[in-house]
Amino acid sequence: MAKKRANGEGNIRKRKDGRWEGRYTAGYDEKTGKRMIKNVLGKTQAEVKEKLAKAVAEAGSVDVRRADEYTLGTWLQTWYELYAKPHLRFPTAEYYRRGIELHITPRIGDIPLKKLTGRDLQGLYKDLREHGRLREAQKGKQPGLSDSTIRGIHTMLHNALDRAVKERLIVRNPADDCVPPKIPKHEMKILPPEQIKSYLTAADQRGVLPMFYLELISGLRKGELVALQWSDLNIENKTISVSKQAGRNNAGEPDITRPKTENSIRKISIPQDAVDLLVAEHQKHPSNPWMFPSPKTGEMYHPDSVVNIHKKILKDAGLEHLRFHDLRHTFATLALQNGVDVKTVSSMLGHFDAGFTLRTYTHVTRQMQESAAEKMGNFMAQVM
């Protein structure tokens, strides 16, 4: 029986048209066992030799038969169902699905996976930035997608193509060659200390003081805040247990879910004033398990409803616009400025590590360093 030529055993010859050709074995047909021969062409023997070496290396690292089965669109669908969807929360999974079905597949989904280039992806990003909106642009709005949305699509593509490399469908990830848009940092704003009293007075007038007081002294995420139940409060130890958040289940229905990370599951110490407010709030609806039930339904507040109440409080108090999430920044900033150490603030916020907290609140920690330097300078001046 004749010996099969191994992948990469190529040969070079000069053709009648004057060009040089290198042939190599790209693999074997699974059904017939016959070799699959491919070639490279060049003007010189040296050029073909270089091309052949590269092609041979690629042939050894790619499952050619399987690679031919996929376009970008069919691979993304396979990756989504097998690797992404089972491990993602519903909002993220839905974001990926929409990105694939509405933005990527209609534009470049027919490109064979093995022929996809970084330039194809870069062109996609350009098109999405200029014409990405599915509905006609509203007055005053651009017709393209935002840089943050395009960056998210790039991240998804990069993950999907990394998996394709691992499964030997492509040699390397073409997304590595792209320059995705940079996301401009959102300007961090906080509620100035001198405005906190006005804010809380307006909250009290709307009957939601306990909820927003707790937010300002804990920095809870809105999904964590509305998911709190009376059983999460330990009156004796003056702590709040954070172990769940408002979210959506795999069917897309509102539901209670676990926080995103293990670090988000935590106990937060609160002052006695907060405990007293929460106890008084519970006495208004002693049989209701929710700490802050909706007055309309008696059920858990929808996170968006809390955001709307926050906007009304700002308006009532005559204060400038501030995102609800900025109340979390307000807590962290004021805690750091008042001497609470970074590690403690980080654990209260449910951050992955204190380093992330340091990077997020650099402006505050820089002020703390300057204050520490001044104190040390004063101390050294006294001892010298």
Label the predicted regions.
Residues 134-147, 151-155, 166-230, 235-236, ...:
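Basic, Lys/Arg- and aromatic-enriched nucleic-acid-binding interface segment
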Residues 116, 148, 152, 299, ...:
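Short basic/aromatic active-site micro-motif
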Residues 15-21, 25-123, 281-291:
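N-terminal DNA-binding module of tyrosine recombinases/phage integrases
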Residues 166, 209, 213, 217-224, ...:
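C-terminal catalytic core of tyrosine-transesterase DNA break-rejoin enzymes
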Residues 232-239, 321, 340-362, 370:
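Short, polar N-cap/turn motifs at the start of nucleic acid-interacting alpha helices
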Residues 43, 182, 190, 246-248, ...:
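Catalytic-site neighborhood detector that most strongly recognizes the C-terminal catalytic loop/helix
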Residues 1-2, 201, 237, 248-276, ...:
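C-terminal secondary-structure termini that scaffold catalytic or DNA-interacting sites
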Residues 98, 190-194, 237, 245-248, ...:
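Active-site/catalytic core of tyrosine-dependent DNA strand-transfer enzymes
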